């Protein structure tokens, strides 16, 4: 519970840092990839249900499309589709990419979807579904994106951005560089982003911040114990204590912004 006028540090991690924390959790703590994926999917499903509630839609009156890539981010979306179906929501999946290229964890979730009988449409074979959806889950790319988006992926992203349904992004909106916030050719314009474990830098750097919508950091089992492999290199601040800072004048400068005292030292030396 936050105390009055408290200012709290929040970790902002790079893709490389997040991979290290994820690996530590799997190898040293013993939490399997599928468990982390299930918890990420639960957080996504919860966010979808909140959006449906805000729109005054009952689960059986809603229709959700989970747009999934072939990596673990896509696996989060596949698992989310199953969890939404369990809650009575009509849910479909659009797979972008060949199912033969699914990661091991995503392929595991895909097999479960088949057993559930949930509709999975291949964009390469069938194109984008000509339907309206209450909510669209963006699970195309996660923090591992390192190239410009072209081809089918670009077409899918631009189609989603033109649709009226609300968009929930898994971890980070597809097309946003998770370190810099830059757009990799095109990007999902999300209404909500559920980021997993720790917040990503690109969600708070522009233009990425303007694409993320409302950001929520979900606890999926990756804790600060993983910082034993290396502390995050960047933090931001949160808490109601931030209200103590005055708004800057539009025509302000360093002479009018005020003064600050920094007490600093090196670790183990001060």
Model-derived regions: residue spans:
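Short gly/ser/thr-rich secondary-structure transition/capping motifs
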Residues: 117-124, 150, 174-178, 240-246
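A short linear-motif detector with a strong N-terminal bias
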Residues: 14-16, 99, 172-175, 193-198, ...
